[in-house]
Amino acid sequence: MRNKIFSSLYFQVLLAITLGVFLGHVYPDLGADMKPLGDGFVKLIKMIIAPVIFCTVVTGIAGMESMKAVGKTGAIALLYFEVVSTIALVIGLCVVNLLQPGVGMNVDPATLDASAISAYAEQAKSQGIIAFLLDVIPGSVIGAFASGNILQVLLFAVLFGFSLHHIGEKGKLIFNVIDSFSQVIFGIINMIMRLAPVGAFGAMAFTIGKYGIGSLVQLGQLIACFYVTCLLFIFMVLGSIARANGFSILRFISYIKEELLIVLGTSSSESVLPRMLVKMEALGCKKSVVGLVIPTGYSFNLDGTSIYLTMAAIFIAQATNTPLDLFQQITLLVVLLISSKGAAGVTGSGFIVLAATISAVGHLPLAGLALILGIDRFMSEARALTNLIGNGVATVVVARYCDQLDEQQMNEVLANPAAVQKVDQHG
């Protein structure tokens, strides 16, 4: 029993995170030097995300009987994403107005060091709905795979899957090759995931070593508000959605606990995308639904990022004594509904989108971003965890509404923790 606990990925990642916090706190310089361990692990995961999405989506779509089902899945998914993301934005707006974590700071924007956020501001200039939509179309197929752009790979995979389905029996050989290739890719994932504790240790040691636990105290009120809001959203909003669709949010969280710990260590929900594809399929969701909803959700269904964006923007207004009336806050909400779709599930993207939003709205001081730059890294954990749980719940809901969910299998898997071990042996 003891060997089983020690050999479980859950225990190893938890131990690694604890050791990372200890090293970063006691030996901050050494902890900061551990950054390459975390970066290396995330790069290994990113290396195989494009082929994983391609194989999953192509085999999922090409293997379907009706193409109408794919269109229905996409439409329901996008509608769900928009509704739930809006709820997340509104909840963030309500909580930050109710608790007012920035009131009383009386910060003069002119005294803030804007040079620290200049790089983010430059990146933010390229953010825009037209630019975002055009960016979904790759300059070349090879370029899409080389850059690892999730939406570009997804677009090509959907078109490839449709075409493969259309040619019927002639494409059977190609279908079998891609299906076999996907098994090889998931075998690689199993090898990479053995390094998850090393990646989590390095990322956590760097975070604590560079920013220090003390930096949490300075702006702790905003961090506390954000974490509480994320918990409220997960257990009240997502919990209600889960209950309405026949499953428990607590059991679902228990089912993906290893993935949540890896995300906690790396601050990137993208680091477990390949594993989530496998786990959601093992839960009873059809491959075609999983292949469309999970990758698309990484750009269109970032609930944690949505909460963060509204809270951070209003916090800056409160801290710098910038008055925002109801109309201006509604305008901010509408802009965020669009700009939040440009945030990918990677560390730092939420901050860039925040910079883009503040630039677009106009009546908030851009220099105010310097206030939360130091603690953004500490809030990214809650963002990524909420994003991951939100995308998992979305997959089950969409699968259920598209009649692509085996509810008996879902109930059996959620009731039986041993099922998780079977998933880990996939491929």
Curated annotation (Swiss-Prot):
InterPro entries: C4_dicarb_transport, Na-dicarboxylate_symporter, Na-dicarboxylate_symporter_CS, Na:dicarbo_symporter_sf. It is found in: Cell inner membrane. It comes from Aeromonas salmonicida (strain A449). GO terms for cellular component: plasma membrane. One of its GO terms (biological process) is L-aspartate transmembrane transport. This is C4-dicarboxylate transport protein. Its main location: membrane. Belongs to the dicarboxylate/amino acid:cation symporter (DAACS) (TC 2.A.23) family. Pfam families: SDF (PF00375). The lineage of its organism: Bacteria, Pseudomonadati, Pseudomonadota, Gammaproteobacteria, Aeromonadales. Keywords: Cell inner membrane, Cell membrane, Membrane, Symport, Transmembrane, Transmembrane helix, Transport. It comes from the Bacteria.
